[in-house]
C-alpha cells in the first residue's frame, strides 16, 4: 500500500502505518484519526451500554445483556475489593476506563492494511486506527486520572492535609520537608506518566509486530505461509495483552483514587 500507488519499500511501509493523519503544525498539531476513533468508540460504548440497560428485564436476559452484566459485575467486584472509601463515581469511572480502553485496544485486531487501504481509496493518505498507539491519547487518559487524584486528595484531606502529606511523609520531621516534598512530588507525578507510557508502549509494540508480520506476505511463498502462522499466534496472544492492559489501567486508577481518599 502506498500513498502514491507505487510499490513501497519495507521502511516506507512501516513508516506509513505508524504515521497519523494530522492537521495543524508544531504544538498545535491534531491527530485527527486518533481523535475520531477514540471519541467514536467512546460514543459506541455509551450507546451499547445504554441500550443494554434500557432493555434490561427481570425475566431471562438476552446474550448481550448477560455479557454486559458480567462485565459490570466484574468491575464492581474489583472496585469493592480495592477501593476502601465511599464514592459512587468510582465504579462507573472504572467501568468506563476498562471498556473504553479495551475497545480502543481491540482495534489492533483488525488486519493492518484493511482500513488504511479503504482510506487511501477515499483520498486519505494516512490512517492509524488504534488510538492507544498514540501517546497523546494515553497521556490524555492518564492526565484525567491525575486531575481526579489531586481533586479527591484535596476534597477528602483539605488543602492543609494534602500539603502536609507532601511535606511530612515519609519522614515526619520539619528538617526533612525538602526531601519529603521531592520524594512525594516525584511519586505523584510518576503515577500518570507510568499509566500513559505502559499502555502506549505495549500497544505500540503490538501494532509494530503486526506490521512486521504483514511484510512477510509480500516476500515469498515460504515466508507468506510462516506469516500466516505467526499472525494467528500473535493475534491469540495479543487478545490477552489488550485485555490485560485495559485491566491494569483500571486497577491502578482505582488504587490511586483509593489512596487519595485515605485521610491520614
Swiss-Prot record:
Where's it found, cell-wise?
Answer: Cell inner membrane
Q: How does it sit in the membrane?
A: Multi-pass membrane protein
Query: Has keyword Transferase?
Result: no
Keywords, alphabetical: ATP synthesis, Cell inner membrane, Cell membrane, CF(0), Hydrogen ion transport, Ion transport, Membrane, Transmembrane, Transmembrane helix, Transport
Note the coiled coil stretches, chain numbering: none
A single Gene Ontology biological process assigned to it is: proton motive force-driven plasma membrane ATP synthesis
Gene Ontology terms, cellular component aspect? plasma membrane; proton-transporting ATP synthase complex
Please name one Pfam family that this protein belongs to: ATP-synt_A
Q: Does the keyword Transport apply?
A: yes
Q: Where are the transmembrane segments?
A: 30-50, 90-110, 111-131, 134-154, 177-197, 208-228, 235-255
Which PROSITE patterns would you find in this protein's record?
ATPASE_A
One GO molecular function term of this record is:
proton-transporting ATP synthase activity, rotational mechanism
Its assembly, as annotated, is: F-type ATPases have 2 components, CF(1) - the catalytic core - and CF(0) - the membrane proton channel. CF(1) has five subunits: alpha(3), beta(3), gamma(1), delta(1), epsilon(1). CF(0) has three main subunits: a(1), b(2) and c(9-12). The alpha and beta chains form an alternating ring which encloses part of the gamma chain. CF(1) is attached to CF(0) by a central stalk formed by the gamma and epsilon chains, while a peripheral stalk is formed by the delta and b chains.
Family in the record: Belongs to the ATPase A chain family.
- What job does the chain carry out? Key component of the proton channel; it plays a direct role in the translocation of protons across the membrane.
Q: What is this protein called?
A: ATP synthase subunit a
Q: Which organism encodes this protein?
A: Shewanella frigidimarina (strain NCIMB 400)
Q: What is the lineage of its organism?
A: Bacteria, Pseudomonadati, Pseudomonadota, Gammaproteobacteria, Alteromonadales
Q: Could you tell me the gene encoding this protein?
A: atpB
